[in-house]
């Protein structure tokens, strides 16, 4: 099986990320699911992967550039997977070990030092430990983890696509 060109693959990766972000916005504004700090961090990482893919598709680099974008996309996707993995881990903690709930992120950005707010965004709060939605027995953070791992593998696959 031959892969489409690297440019086409990067564009498809970008479109998949855009669909993930559109789904997140749909669940927030139509489904009434308010995102927790880790959910917002995951959205930022999906956006970062999307921007890497879009830059690669627009730039249309030669072999070395394709490999650089492939590694960058994989690294960013694995960073997102680590955030999703922490979120899934928080969901499976016993109730007595769940961190305390904190104020909303907009309040934290206005009233707390930036470092404390970023720490809350990356480590999660008690809000991150409740399951509001499942599909096929998996929570939304578990599905996002699967998507990040798939995006990372898809990006890394472009390494070999650069040889064509």
Curated annotation (Swiss-Prot):
SUPFAM superfamilies: DsbB-like. It is found in: Cell inner membrane. Residues 1-9, 62-68, 162-164 are cytoplasmic. Disulfide bonds join 36-39, 101-128. One of its GO terms (cellular component) is plasma membrane. GO terms for biological process: protein folding. Residues 27-44, 86-142 are periplasmic. Keywords: Cell inner membrane, Cell membrane, Chaperone, Disulfide bond, Electron transport, Membrane, Oxidoreductase, Redox-active center, Transmembrane, Transmembrane helix, Transport. GO terms for molecular function: electron transfer activity; protein-disulfide reductase activity. It is a multi-pass membrane protein. The chain crosses the membrane at residues 10-26, 45-61, 69-85, 143-161. InterPro entries: DiS_bond_form_DsbB/BdbC (IPR003752), Disulphide_bond_form_DsbB (IPR022920), DsbB (IPR050183), DsbB-like_sf (IPR023380). Pfam families: DsbB. Belongs to the DsbB family. Required for disulfide bond formation in some periplasmic proteins. Acts by oxidizing the DsbA protein. HAMAP family: DsbB. This is Disulfide bond formation protein B. The gene is dsbB.
């Amino acid at each position: 099986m031959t892969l489409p060109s690297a440019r086409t693959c990067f564009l498809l990766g970008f479109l998949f990320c855009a669909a993930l972000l559109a789904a997140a916005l749909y669940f927030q504004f139509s489904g009434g699911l308010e995102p927790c700090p880790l959910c917002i961090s995951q959205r930022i990482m999906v956006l970062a992967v999307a921007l890497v893919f879009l830059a690669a598709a627009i730039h249309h680099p030669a072999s070395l550039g394709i490999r650089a974008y492939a590694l960058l996309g994989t690294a960013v996707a694995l960073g997102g997977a680590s955030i999703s993995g922490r979120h899934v881990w928080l969901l499976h903690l016993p109730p007595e070990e769940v961190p305390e709930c904190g104020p909303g992120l907009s309040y934290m950005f206005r009233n707390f030092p930036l470092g404390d707010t970023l720490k809350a965004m990356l480590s999660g709060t008690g809000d991150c430990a409740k399951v509001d939605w499942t599909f096929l027995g998996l929570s939304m953070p578990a599905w996002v983890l699967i998507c990040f791992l798939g995006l990372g593998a898809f990006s890394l696959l472009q390494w070999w696509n650069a040889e064509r």
